[in-house]
């Protein structure tokens, strides 16, 4: 069963890569007990590729858990505030650095 969090970004967007990296780092810090599946570069033929490639700003698809994994879903449901803070920290770090 798939487990962990991952961040998908446009493979030709340096700013998207940086944003995905900052988000991944904030999630790894906030949830050390969860598995990081890392960053995934998308192209136009990948599922989600159109979304991250057709925007006019850096875009990242954040997947904190797999919907098919009830244990991970329940974990993040019980830690919504920490989840929101991890998103905010990652975005803030991207904006100021």
What do these predicted regions represent?
Residues 22-33, 90-97:
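Structured segments of extracytoplasmic/periplasmic soluble domains
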Residues 1, 12-15, 33-34, 44-48, ...:
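Solvent-exposed loop/turn segments at secondary-structure junctions
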Residues 1-30:
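A short, glycine/acidic-enriched catalytic loop
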Residues 40-97:
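Active-site-adjacent mobile loop/cap segments within catalytic or ligand-binding domains
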Residues 35-39:
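Short beta-strand elements
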């Amino acid at each position: 069963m798939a487990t962990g969090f991952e961040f998908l970004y446009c493979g030709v967007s340096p700013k998207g890569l940086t944003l995905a990296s900052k988000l991944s780092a904030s999630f790894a810090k906030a949830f050390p007990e969860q598995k990081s599946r890392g960053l995934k570069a998308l192209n136009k033929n990948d599922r989600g590729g159109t979304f991250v490639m057709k925007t006019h700003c850096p875009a990242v698809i954040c997947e904190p858990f797999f919907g098919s994994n009830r244990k991970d879903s329940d974990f993040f449901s019980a830690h919504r505030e920490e989840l929101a803070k991890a998103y905010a920290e990652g975005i803030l770090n991207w904006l100021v650095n």
